[in-house]
């Protein structure tokens, strides 16, 4: 830049003030006006003249214009001011053209040929006050602005006083200050939108125009200086607002700011705005209509500026773009004011019709509006529109949709704007900007605009002449606030650069800096080239590029931008892409598949566009609407898809690529494909196919790969057709599959073949090259006159003839073997030579001949038909009801052995075969058998026989069939036979409660359980010997049962539980141990004659009840234990398990149990009845239910430890004893009884143990023992009972000896075993060498009481495994029995484990007489050896069948019923019964997951009615039955022809109203109902048909002039004819004939009424 801004500053300020306020404003609102008389002086202050025009002296030896000085002096407020000013030579260039137009004519035109000397810049000096700059114009007095003591002063000649010779001209001086009213914040509105898209037709014109400029187009991305030669037009509103003298300076100031914006480095290109012409319109132009409607104004202005533009780009006044500045309030699309600030055509620059814009004058921000619209002309889109440079909420840019001025941030160009304008220039669309303007251009002022226009002036430009700056509102460099009336308003823009913001400070780029500070201009410099980028494509021809930036340094402060190449490109990745890969354009289109278009997602496919090959045009795959998705495709995209070309797109421009794959190299191939070749290696092959006969497709010849200049043509016209196929016989390029295609271009083997058919003559041409061999075929329809073909290929380098090459090739496929459905096609083999074509098979090698091919072929679907299966056997062998059935389906044949079933409706058009037919009805059936009633059962209980009579009823003539004779006898089973028993408790029977009240609550717990009733009201006997007192039984109370109770009375439990299926015991076995087996006991029936009760279900909420169980009728010896070998029974718990006491893993069952140990053993034993105190009976009150696996878990031993806790295991060996319910470890969920082998007698197994195994020297008991029922469980071995070395000897007395005392007993238990009580103090041998047995006389029987911890040597505290259990004994007495031996009584062992793990089972115990001989005890009072036991229900999950899937496709679900049931009778249980077992099976599963298929719909059939509302139907089927969504099933019918059954009926045409000269014919038109034949009153019912014409012209020919007959006189009287004439009747022919004298003939010029057209309706 030149070094002149500092000098230009004052002179431009002077010019601004000279062109400042309009006339008449000098004295308005000015305070402190002072009259001064300036004079011109010399440098020393000496007077020179009263004439103020500066005189310039020039030296002849100075060739260039030099600035001369001028000095002025004046007295102001007693101070002498001296102005030192200099001429500004840079304000306007020579040749400046300023036109003033009036009434559409050139009122004034001024061409500046020299720099005027009256525009001065300088300073003012005062001896005392601080001076400042001055900008003064002395062309007509002194006008301008100067600074004094940091205040602005204006000077102007005094209005109305002219200069007088010899006298100083008076001037007025006043301060420049605005109103200091209280500032109020006002509303501010953002600027409106702008920009106008180029219409498609004009865009095509641009493309055509640009193609004509190809010779000037730059082929690389080069940064080159661009000069925008600009025409600026200010309309009459601008002149009216600013005043004619001031508008020129104002426009130049605005354009100077615009030029500065385009010099900002953010634009990325060196662009200069140069004004070549300025037009000021004082009046409205005739051809330029400026209105509020911005689009119409822009259209008018573009047309007007084109007409006045001077042709020829070299002319000094030729402009590249035109700018209209107006004070009209513009609106984009309506003729009324709104918020639009400007409008322009996008990418319209350099186009003669589109390079124009309109901007609304809003004051100093007008510069940003002009720059914004010029940006649109450069092809820049709004930030955020189609790009990612949205500025809302972020930094504003010049191209923001709305011009928002951020506080303190200058407006610059965004990154997207830089890319848009660079692409515009690189595409060659700015060719008109390359020429540098001539020297005769308008020079723009370089002074900052704020120096010329202070804040008050800027406010007046924005809001009117009465607006002033609002002080103290905000930093003026950030936001300019102006007064409008009594409030302050702002357009949120900052004051322009150069505006004073404080003492000796001004605004510069939004900041307040010291005055006069202007940063030094820095010219830009190129950076180094970047590394080559990645290739734009992974295959095919791509592009990679390298760039450099103008960043070293970045141009600043109006420094020059870099000039030169900024981007270079080269090709890369030359290998071709695989043929099955989508094209590069297709890939770019598919990137928009995930974006919504018109509310839906689409799959986009490319659309070729040869007019704009480097734009991305795509369309949805299911639509034909084409959209331009990108302004430019990715670099490396081929320009054309429809033709062979190497040209690629680069920066949106189609670049030519030579055969050497260098951009713009110009290298070309010769006719056989040699790059830069001369054709010397080319060879043309020419052949003719002359076979005249053929059938179907016949091979003619082979065109090899790489062939060029291909020509195939028929020698003469014929009805045959040419076809092209690949080496794969299934792949046809043209006219394959017996289908003839249209004329046109077709892609074949990588090239384009042009198919032409004129009449019956066909030919094919292609430039080539072919990428694969192509077979030429002829589809014979008649005799072949001959086919000629030729092509050009490259000759081998050694110029030798190749030997013939023979190979097998497959021919075309034969016709399908079926006419419908699926058939078979076969493909034959031919022997082919590479160039000769088909030859005899003998030339090919028969050893490598491949097999002929075969494939399925699908023709049209076969029509549906009925299919009937085989007849089934007759349902009756005789009689009238015999029927035979068969399956009948509607099927469609899919192949030779494949059919598909269809809906029955598909075969409705065919008669359906019979599915049923009568059969065997002629056969007479034999007579039937008659049966009598069954007799009574032969027994009263148990199993018996019943009978009936059978007779043949002769109801037919045929005898009865003996094979069908019914049975006459059958078994009958009554209730089991009961036997009498003395039962203590008869209060409960059966299942459930004896009380009428039932408690079904799950958690119901009775506060007090009622005791059982007493058997008799006799006094309580005294306990003697080993009899234990038993308390009297209380009356019965309520019994609580589970909701799901179990009645097992139907089960026959009156069988021998001791034998079961085993043998009877042998009497020889009953002889050991001093005790014998009891005799056979026959039970008696229960006194109450009630069914045997069952216990409540284990695990239920209510308490389990021990009723009076009926004993088993047969009890074997195995039911007894040896005398003295006792087993303690586990006392069940009566208290509920709390949540804290429940062991881990145990089910929360909530059953009751009793505390352990009991308070007294007396509670357990009591005499059976009076008179027999020696007999014992175990008390079975309702508080002692049978032991359960779960109730064992919280039992306590005598030391308080819970039973079932494990300890270090003792050596184990099974021993014969009765099992007790096993204890359960904390992790067990159900009992697991040990399984043992059972024999037929207990004694047989016990004797060997005592005699053989229990001998001295044996350290262990036998490991395996076979015992009879009840089953045996393992028990701990008993080492050390008599010491470690004192095992049991043979003959050791049994443990029933009465000499043993409880102090000498030791009790050992193991989980799942019976308690064995053995002597503990037998270490001193007796006289016979055997251990002495302690005397137990007077003590309780062994095993009846637990050994106290303080009296025994081993207790539970020392060994947790040894845990004594309480005994449970029971005896029944009968006074009728003979008296037993003295003190002899029945002794019972512990109850065994229940025979089942769930449901109803049985338990056993050993019963023996205390004397060792059962005969000493009363047999009738023998206690029950067995009873029922009822554990938890046998619960299991039971699943039902899966329901039908809710959806056949698309994801459905099916459900099933899952219940907890009893496995015995399948009764439902509550779910918690099944919780301990396996997890609950799922009751829901997914199904129908396969995707749904779309419904198939056929076309609509013909409407059922022609009118009045009919119905159309169509076929709606699913391709696979059940795999379509039913809710989406399309309708198979719809209404049609809903219009009424009416039509227009017309009558015949009537007679013409005139014989000639134009008449009218009429006819009757009626709307008639076609069903009733009656006319409709409302003609609108026929509106669905066109209205017939009801009249038409007729006799349009002219009437011949016939000389009327000579009229002598009127035939009627004169008066009468006159009367008719006056009445207008002369027009009637009869009247005219009768009154020929009175009625003159009609004039030929008067039209007749026949020409008048009557109304249609």
From Swiss-Prot:
Ranges of biased composition (kind: Polar residues): 180-191, 1293-1304, 1327-1342
Record-listed Zn(2+) binding positions: 194, 372, 376, 382
Domain PLAC positions: 1587-1627
Record keywords: Cleavage on pair of basic residues, Disulfide bond, Extracellular matrix, Glycoprotein, Hydrolase, Metal-binding, Metalloprotease, Protease, Proteoglycan, Repeat, Secreted, Signal, Zinc, Zymogen
SS bonds (residue pairs): 302-356, 331-338, 350-432, 389-416, 459-482, 470-488, 477-507, 501-512, 535-572, 539-577, 550-562
Keyword flag Cell wall biogenesis/degradation: no
Enzyme Commission numbers on file: 3.4.24.-
Biological process terms in GO annotation: cellular response to BMP stimulus; cellular response to interleukin-1; cellular response to tumor necrosis factor; chondrocyte differentiation; collagen fibril organization; negative regulation of chondrocyte differentiation; ossification; ossification involved in bone maturation
Alphabetical list of SUPFAM superfamilies matching this protein: Metalloproteases ('zincins'), catalytic domain, TSP-1 type 1 repeat
Motif window: Cysteine switch: 192-199
GO molecular function, one term: metal ion binding
Domain Disintegrin: 447-522
Top-level taxonomic group: Eukaryota
Positions annotated with a glycan in the UniProt record: 84, 622
Known function: Metalloprotease. Was previously shown to degrade COMP. However, a later study found no activity against COMP.
Name of the protein in question: A disintegrin and metalloproteinase with thrombospondin motifs 7
Organism, scientific name: Mus musculus (Mouse)
């Amino acid at each position: 830049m030149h070094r002149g801004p500092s000098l230009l500053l004052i002179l431009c300020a002077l010019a601004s003030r000279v062109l400042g306020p309009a006339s008449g404003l000098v004295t308005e609102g000015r305070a402190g006006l002072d009259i001064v008389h300036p004079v011109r002086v010399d440098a020393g202050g000496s007077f020179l003249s009263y004439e103020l025009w500066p005189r310039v002296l020039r030296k002849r030896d100075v060739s260039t214009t030099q600035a001369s000085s001028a000095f002025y002096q004046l007295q102001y407020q007693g101070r002498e001011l001296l102005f030192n000013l200099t001429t500004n030579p840079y304000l306007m260039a020579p040749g400046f053209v300023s036109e003033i137009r009036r009434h559409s004519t050139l009122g004034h035109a001024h061409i500046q040929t020299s720099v005027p000397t009256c525009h001065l810049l300088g300073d003012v000096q005062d001896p005392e006050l601080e001076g400042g700059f001055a900008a003064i114009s002395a062309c007509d007095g002194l006008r301008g602005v100067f600074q004094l003591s940091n205040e602005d002063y204006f000077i102007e000649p005094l209005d109305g006083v002219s200069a007088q010779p010899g006298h100083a001209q008076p001037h007025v001086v006043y301060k420049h200050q605005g109103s200091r009213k209280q500032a109020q914040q006002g509303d501010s509105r953002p600027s409106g939108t702008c920009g106008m898209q180029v219409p498609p037709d004009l865009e095509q014109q641009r493309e055509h125009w640009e193609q004509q400029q190809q010779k000037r187009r730059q082929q690389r991305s080069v940064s080159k200086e661009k000069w925008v030669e600009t025409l600026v037009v200010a309309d009459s509103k601008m002149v009216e607002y600013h005043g004619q003298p001031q508008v020129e300076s104002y426009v130049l100031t605005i354009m100077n700011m615009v030029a500065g914006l385009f010099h900002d480095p953010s634009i990325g290109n060196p662009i200069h705005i140069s004004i070549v012409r300025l037009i000021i319109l004082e009046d409205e132009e005739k051809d330029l209509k400026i209105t509020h409607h911005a689009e119409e104004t822009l259209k008018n202005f573009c047309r007007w500026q084109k007409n006045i533009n001077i042709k020829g780009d070299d002319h000094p006044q030729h402009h590249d773009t035109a700018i209209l500045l107006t004070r009209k309030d513009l609106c984009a699309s309506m003729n009324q004011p709104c918020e639009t600030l400007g409008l322009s055509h996008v990418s319209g620059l350099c186009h003669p019709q589109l390079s124009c814009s309109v901007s609304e004058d809003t004051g100093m921000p007008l510069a940003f509006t002009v720059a914004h619209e010029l940006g649109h002309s450069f092809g820049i889109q709004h930030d955020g529109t189609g790009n990612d440079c949205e500025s809302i909420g972020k930094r504003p840019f010049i191209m923001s949709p709305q011009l928002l001025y951020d506080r303190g941030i200058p407006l610059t160009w965004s990154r997207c704007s830089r890319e848009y304008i660079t692409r515009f220039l690189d595409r060659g669309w700015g060719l008109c900007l390359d020429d540098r303007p001539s020297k005769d251009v308008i020079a723009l002022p370089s002074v900052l605009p704020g120096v010329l226009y202070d804040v008050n002036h800027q406010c007046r430009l924005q809001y009117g002449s009465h607006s002033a700056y609002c002080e103290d509102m905000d930093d003026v460099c950030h936001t300019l606030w102006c007064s409008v009336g009594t409030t302050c308003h702002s357009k949120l823009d900052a004051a322009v650069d150069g505006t004073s913001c404080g003492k000796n400070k001004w605004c510069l780029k939004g900041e307040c800096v010291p005055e006069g500070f202007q940063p030094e201009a820095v010219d830009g410099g190129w950076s180094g080239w970047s590394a080559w980028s990645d290739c734009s494509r992974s295959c095919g021809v791509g592009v990679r590029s390298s760039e450099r930036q103008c960043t070293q340094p970045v141009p600043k402060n109006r420094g020059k931008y870099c000039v030169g190449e900024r981007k270079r490109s080269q090709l890369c990745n030359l290998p071709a892409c695989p043929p099955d890969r989508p094209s590069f354009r297709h890939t770019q289109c598919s990137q928009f598949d995930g974006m919504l278009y018109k509310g839906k997602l689409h799959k986009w496919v490319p659309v070729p566009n040869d007019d704009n090959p480097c734009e991305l045009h795509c369309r949805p795959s299911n639509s034909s609407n084409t959209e331009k998705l990108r302004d430019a495709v990715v670099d490396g995209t081929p320009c054309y898809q429809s033709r062979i070309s190497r040209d690629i797109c680069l920066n949106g421009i189609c670049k030519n690529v030579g055969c050497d794959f260098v951009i713009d190299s110009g290298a070309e191939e010769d006719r056989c494909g040699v790059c830069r070749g001369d054709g010397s290696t080319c060879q043309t092959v020419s052949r003719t196919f002359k076979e005249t006969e053929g059938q179907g497709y016949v091979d003619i010849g082979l065109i090899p790969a790489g062939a060029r200049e291909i020509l195939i043509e028929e020698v003469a016209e014929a009805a045959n057709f040419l076809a092209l196929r690949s080496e794969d016989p299934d792949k046809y390029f043209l006219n394959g599959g017996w289908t003839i295609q249209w004329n046109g271009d077709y892609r074949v083997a990588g090239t384009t073949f042009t198919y032409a058919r004129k009449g019956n003559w066909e030919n094919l041409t292609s430039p080539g090259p072919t990428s694969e061999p192509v077979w030429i075929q002829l589809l014979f329809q008649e005799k072949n006159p001959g086919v000629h073909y030729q092509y050009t290929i490259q000759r081998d380098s050694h110029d030798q003839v190749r030997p013939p090459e023979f190979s097998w090739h497959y021919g075309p496929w034969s016709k399908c073997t079926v006419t419908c459905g699926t058939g078979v096609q076969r493909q034959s083999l031919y022997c082919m030579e590479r160039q000769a074509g088909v030859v005899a098979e003998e030339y090919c090698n028969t050893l490598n001949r491949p097999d002929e091919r075969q494939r399925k072929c699908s023709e049209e679907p076969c029509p549906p038909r009925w299919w009937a299966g085989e007849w089934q056997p007759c349902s009756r062998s005789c009689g009238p009801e015999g029927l035979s059935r068969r399956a009948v389906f509607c099927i469609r044949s899919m192949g030779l052995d494949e059919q598909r079933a269809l809906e029955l409706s598909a075969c409705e058009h065919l008669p359906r075969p019979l599915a049923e037919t009568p059969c065997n009805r002629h056969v007479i059936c034999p007579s039937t058998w008659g049966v009598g009633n069954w007799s009574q059962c032969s027994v009263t209980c148990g199993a018996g026989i019943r009978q009936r009579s059978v007779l043949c009823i002769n109801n037919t003539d045929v005898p009865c069939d003996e094979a069908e004779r019914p049975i006459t006898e059958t078994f009958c089973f009554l209730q089991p036979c009961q036997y009498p028993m003395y039962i203590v408790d008869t209060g409960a029977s059966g299942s459930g409660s004896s009380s009428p009240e039932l408690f079904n609550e799950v958690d119901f717990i009775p506060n007090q359980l009622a005791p059982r009733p007493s058997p008799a009201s006799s006094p309580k006997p005294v306990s003697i010997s080993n009899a234990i007192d038993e308390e009297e039984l209380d009356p019965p109370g309520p019994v609580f049962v589970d909701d799901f109770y179990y009645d097992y009375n139907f089960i026959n439990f009156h069988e021998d539980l001791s034998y079961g299926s085993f043998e009877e015991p042998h009497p020889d076995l009953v002889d050991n141990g001093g005790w014998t087996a009891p005799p056979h006991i026959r039970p008696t029936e229960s006194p109450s004659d009630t069914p045997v009760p069952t216990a409540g279900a284990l695990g239920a909420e209510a308490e389990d009840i021990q009723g009076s169980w009926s004993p088993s009728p047969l009890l074997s010896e195995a039911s007894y234990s040896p005398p003295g070998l006792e087993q303690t029974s586990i006392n069940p718990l009566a208290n509920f398990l709390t949540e804290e006491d429940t062991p881990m893993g145990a089910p929360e069952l909530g059953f009751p149990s009793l505390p352990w140990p009991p308070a007294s053993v007396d509670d357990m034993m009591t005499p059976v009845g009076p008179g027999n105190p020696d007999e014992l009976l175990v008390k079975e009150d309702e508080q002692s239910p049978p032991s359960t696996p779960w109730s064992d878990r919280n039992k306590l031993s005598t030391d308080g430890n819970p039973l079932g806790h494990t300890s270090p295991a003792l050596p184990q060996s099974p021993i014969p004893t009765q099992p007790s319910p096993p204890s359960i470890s904390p992790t067990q969920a159900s009992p697991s009884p040990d399984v043992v082998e059972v024999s037929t007698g207990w004694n047989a197994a016990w004797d060997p143990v005592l005699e053989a195994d229990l001998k001295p020297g044996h350290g262990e008991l036998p490991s395996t023992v076979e015992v009879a029922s009840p089953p045996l469980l393992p028990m701990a071995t008993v080492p050390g009972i008599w010491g470690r070395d004192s095992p049991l000897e043979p003959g050791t007395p049994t443990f029933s000896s009465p000499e043993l005392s409880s102090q000498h007993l030791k009790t050992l238990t193991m989980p799942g075993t019976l308690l064995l009580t053995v002597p503990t103090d037998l270490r001193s041998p007796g006289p016979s060498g055997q251990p002495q047995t302690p005397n137990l006389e007077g003590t309780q029987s062994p095993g009846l009481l637990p050994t106290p911890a303080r009296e025994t040597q081993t207790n539970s505290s020392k060994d947790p495994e040894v845990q004594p259990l309480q005994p449970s004994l029971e005896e029944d007495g009968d006074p009728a029995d003979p008296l037993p031996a003295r003190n002899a009584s029945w002794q019972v062992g512990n109850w065994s484990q229940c025979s089942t793990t769930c449901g109803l089972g049985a338990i056993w115990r050993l019963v023996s007489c205390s004397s060792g001989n059962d005969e000493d005890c009363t047999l009738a009072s023998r206690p029950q050896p067995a009873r029922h036991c009822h554990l938890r229900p046998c619960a299991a999950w039971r699943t039902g069948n899966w329901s039908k899937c809710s959806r056949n496709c698309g994801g459905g679900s099916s459900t099933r019923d899952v219940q907890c049931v009893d496995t015995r009778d399948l009764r439902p249980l509550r779910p918690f019964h099944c919780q301990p077992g396996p997890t609950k099976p799922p009751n829901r599963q997914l199904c129908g997951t396969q995707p749904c298929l779309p419904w198939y719909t056929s076309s609509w059939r013909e409407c059922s009615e022609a009118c009045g509302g009919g119905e159309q139907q169509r076929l709606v089927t699913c391709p696979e039955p059940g795999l379509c969504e039913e809710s989406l099933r399309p309708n198979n019918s719809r209404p049609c022809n809903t219009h009424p059954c009416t039509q227009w009926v017309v009558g015949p045409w009537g007679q013409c109203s005139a014989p000639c000269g134009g008449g009218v014919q009429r006819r009757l038109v009626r709307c008639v109902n076609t069903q009733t034949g009656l006319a409709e009153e409302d003609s609108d019912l026929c509106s669905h048909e066109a209205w017939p014409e009801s009249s038409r012209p007729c006799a349009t020919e002219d009437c011949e002039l016939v000389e009327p007959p000579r009229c002598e006189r009127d035939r009627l009287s004169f008066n009468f004819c006159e009367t008719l004439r006056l009445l207008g009747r002369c027009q009637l022919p009869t009247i005219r004939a009768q009154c020929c004298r009175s009625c003159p003939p009609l004039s030929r010029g008067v039209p007749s009424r026949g020409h008048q057209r009557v109304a249609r309706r």
